[in-house]
Amino acid sequence: MGHVDVARVSLALPDGRLLLDEVSLRVGEAQKTALIGPNGAGKTTLLRIIIGDLAPDSGTVTGSGGLGVMRQFVGSVRDDSTVRDLLVSVAPPRLRAAAAELDAAELAMMDRDDRPTQLRYANALAEWSDAGGWDAEVLWDTCTVAAIGVGFDKARWREVRTLSGGEQKRLVIEALLRGPDEVLLLDEPDNYLDVPAKRWLEQALIDSPKTVLYVSHDRELLARTAKGIVTLELGAAGNTTWVHGGGFASYAQAREDRNSRLEERLRRWDEERVKLRALVLRLREKSAYNDGMAGAYQAACTRLERFERDGPPRAVPRRQSVTMRLRGGRTAKRAVICESLELTGLMKPFDLEVWFGERIGVLGSNGSGKSHFLRLLAAGGSDPDPEHRPVAGTPIGAVRHSGQARLGARVRPGWFAQTHEHPELIGRTLLDILWKGDRHRDGMGREQAARVLDRYELAVAGEQQFETLSGGQQARLQILLLELSGATLLLLDEPTDNLDIASADALQAGLEAFEGTVVAVTHDRWFARSFDRFVIFAADGSVVESDVASWDEGRVERAR
């Protein structure tokens, strides 16, 4: 089995700010370790250093056993890549190289059929075989059946963007767990997964003999699988790590105890410095008229200089403080009305009424149509009019349906996109986005914009472009824009997926104070506890209402 060892790694950002300050951690053989911390603290950056994508300014990374990697973007792939491309991308390096050469040789054969081209193709096939390509395809067949319900031959050329986010995640995780690499780095493996798939992931990690370092904010996953927890903590001069050798059940108390010890050490250090400075002052006064005290004075000065040169003990990490002020406004009593609504090719016709002020959770398996339902409402329903125009400039694709979905009077939908798709924000900094505003919200002065960003712990990222933010920072910005937009109906598609624990708590507090209606798709079992009732997209294609959450719905059976 393999291991990962990170020793005193530091990295500065291009603007000179220190992001990681002598970060250290070790993941031993077969250990399951979680990497947690605030959004934007550098978790994904640290994984990229371990992978080798980034070179640290100082420190070392060593390991053994081969490295399998699932990057954070898996689940939100929207390009023209195929299922085969995705599986090849997480294969070992030799297999990736063999696949690239085989693809190039096949393209060359289409242009010309001369002897050198034929020889190149034959050599590429031989290398594909020697690299384990045929064996990999047998393994991938098992993975595609488990993840999307069809064999590899049928799924091979299917575009990844036609899969739900959860199906993309499940496919890659299946391939990595069954693959040859002994060390796995998983960036947000639970994002986009429905609850049955999360339960599968939990058991798969427990059963796997592989060494796993994963980033997650899902407390259920942490509690069930993590045997060690590495926390990236915010620091004034760069973020540092604290390693907890136990599980999540003991984590909160252990961290509180450790922070109390740090506070006590710092208090004692401050007291000692005050005493030493007072001693130096007394001896200086005495030595001014007593030559015999000169030696004692110099000794005290040396002692104080050495004490201050060694510096204070490690400071208590800065605590996150996210404050969301979602306001809303009064609307008609019936906020959403669905009559014989059928999402074409997804779910059977259903009726639904959502009343002003309700908190509705939308549950069901991946691919069942939940996100399509939210997009239909976000676009204003079946026959949108100006009163129901969305409060954001994000393009919303048409949703094929029959029947009717209507919004009540004064209902303004605000949509939180699961994949953070905001082409209108690409290339723009956060301060620029808030300063200029758009047709849905007024702009604001730079000082006011900075204060608003600070409430969301985004002030430090104010000059960053939207696409360079971490997933959690993008999620917080989406919620901030909803706060400023005047939405009275919040349509939230997996809003807690990328949020760290403190931000998820802040979102729940913000929703409790929101004077409006909330409809949220979620697979977050903790987040769902705050909802009034649930709309369940069932495995048989029906849509049913329930007062209790149901997490056991299987995949909707349809042609794939």
Regions found by a protein language model. Give the residues of each.
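ABC ATP-binding cassette signature C-motif
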Residues: M1-L262, M324, R330-R560
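Non-transmembrane amphipathic alpha-helical segments
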Residues: A98-M109, A124, W269, R273-L283, ...
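Proline-centered turn/helix-capping motifs that create local helix->coil transitions or kinks
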Residues: A136, R306-P317
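Short amphipathic coiled-coil heptad-repeat segments
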Residues: D141-I148, L279-R282, R303-D310
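ABC ATPase nucleotide-binding domains
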Residues: N259-L283, S287, D291-T302, G554-R560
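An exposure/low-complexity boundary signal
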Residues: A300-E305, L482-E483
